[in-house]
Every structure is written in structure tokens, then in C-alpha cells.
């Protein structure tokens, strides 16, 4: 998957007002498939609500309409952890599971501007992570999972290619 270097900087700039208020911000990573290569070309910030440790999209039909109009595929999502470290919480794992069930190559990016490391690109392991999360029936939002490698850093696997090109930014908030 090809990912623009400027994505993190542009997303954090848009998220900054929320980050300063300790509110998470999320976005959708969209792009195209060309010559068997997935390329993220567009960052879409949908209408959303957030708290210090959650972010939920709203009016998804606006997002789908924009993507359909511009022939954009969904390749994953990006969100901030305003004060927490760079990891996937149990809520994040369940959110990402739906993306990865639809597209096995889907990624989840976490930006933690106040921490080191401050940027991570993650995927559920398959197996066992995708199976564990997709069959989890815990009722509480934040909960524990078995102590197994449920997700991995996608940038360590050679799966992500950081390249030097611009990203289109669409703010639907």
C-alpha cells in the first residue's frame, strides 16, 4: 500500500483544535487500485463526535456519496490519541475489524502527538487477531482480549511504502 508522507502532518493540523481540547478526531483513508497497487490519495474527515478516548462518525451517507462520486475505495482509517500512547485500544480493534473484514489490506493509523512514538500504522494479525476480534462478544466498549499477537505494526512488514506525493483533503465536518 502506498501512503503519502504528508498524511500525518496534514491530519494532525486538521485535528489540532480537537487535540487541544483532548478530543479524538478520525478520518477515512481513501484511494484507488492501479496496477495491483493500493494508493491512498484522499483523506476524508467525516462529520463526527469525539471524546477523550473515542471518536464516532455521523451522517455516513455524505461520506459514501463523496466516495462514490469520486470513485474512491476505503483503505482504512486514521485517528488521534490526544494524550494516550500510540496503540490500538479494544474499541479501535473492533472498529478496525470491520475495515479489515471488508478489505484484508486495510490499515489503522494512530497519531499520538504528545507521545513517542507518535505515529503507528497497524493491522490485525490473521490469524489469530482477526478471528479473535470478529468473534468477541464483550458488551463493554473497553475490555481485554487474550494475550496473543492481535495486531501488528504494518510499517515493519514491508507492506507500507511511504512515498512523496500530495494527499487530497476533504473535510465534511
Where are these regions (language model features)?
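Conserved beta-strand-loop surface patch within small alpha/beta domains used
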Residues: 1-74, 83-173
Amino acid at each position: 500500500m502506498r501512503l503519502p508522507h504528508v498524511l500525518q502532518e496534514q491530519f494532525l493540523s486538521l485535528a489540532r483544535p480537537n487535540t487541544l481540547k483532548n478530543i479524538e478526531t478520525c478520518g477515512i483513508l481513501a484511494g484507488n487500485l492501479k496496477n495491483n497497487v493500493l494508493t491512498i490519495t484522499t483523506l476524508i474527515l467525516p462529520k463526527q463526535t469525539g471524546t477523550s478516548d473515542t471518536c464516532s462518525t455521523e451522517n455516513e451517507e455524505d461520506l459514501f456519496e463523496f466516495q462514490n462520486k469520486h470513485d474512491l475505495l476505503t483503505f482504512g482509517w486514521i485517528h488521534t490519541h490526544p494524550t494516550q500512547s500510540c496503540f490500538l485500544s479494544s474499541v479501535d480493534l473492533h472498529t478496525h475489524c470491520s475495515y479489515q473484514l471488508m478489505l484484508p489490506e486495510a490499515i489503522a493509523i494512530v497519531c499520538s502527538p504528545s507521545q513517542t512514538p507518535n505515529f503507528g500504522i497497524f493491522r490485525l494479525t490473521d490469524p489469530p487477531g482477526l478471528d479473535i476480534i470478529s468473534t468477541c462478544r464483550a458488551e463493554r466498549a473497553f475490555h481485554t482480549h487474550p494475550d496473543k499477537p492481535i495486531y501488528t505494526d504494518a510499517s515493519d512488514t514491508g507492506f507500507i511504502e511511504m512515498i512523496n506525493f500530495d494527499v487530497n483533503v476533504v473535510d465534511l465536518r
